[in-house]
A protein has these predicted regions:
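Conserved N-terminal catalytic core of the sugar/cofactor nucleotidyltransferase
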Residues: 2-5, 13, 27, 31-115
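Short alpha-helical oligomerization interface
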Residues: 19-23
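A short, conserved beta-strand element in the Rossmann-like catalytic core
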Residues: 118-119
Length: 119
């Protein structure tokens, strides 16, 4: 089973807090919000891989996070998928991003889809 985390929004309603930081990486109780999301799903043994789909603006932020994340709450590998959107005018939207991950990663398995900013 695969986990897909939707995190390609621009969080403009939270500016200036999210001007240079994606909302799922904002700290909540001392760790990024997305770490809480992953920890809440860590008990599902069937999940063997996770994908975070994001945009061009924040892809580097998520790559850096993925390289140093604490995997104690969620052991499977987490891969970052860049949808290459650069703003609200060319973003793919949730369904478009989901389709992108399914196709580009060759996923032919059950999936769980969650938002990266829901606790």
């Amino acid at each position: 089973m695969k986990l897909i985390i939707l995190a390609a929004g621009y969080a403009t309603r939270l500016y200036p807090l999210t001007l240079n930081q994606p909302k799922p990486l904002l700290p909540v109780a001392g760790k990024p919000m997305v770490d809480h999301v992953l920890a809440s799903l860590g008990a599902i043994d069937a999940i063997d891989e996770a994908f975070i789909v994001t945009n061009e603006k924040f892809a580097g932020h998520f790559e850096a996070w993925a390289g140093r994340r604490d995997s104690s709450g969620f052991a499977p590998p987490v891969r970052v998928v860049n949808d290459h959107s650069t703003g609200d005018d060319n973003k793919l939207g949730a369904i478009g991003d989901l389709h992108l991950v399914l196709k580009t990663q060759g996923i032919d398995d059950d999936v769980i889809v969650v938002a990266g900013d829901n606790l």
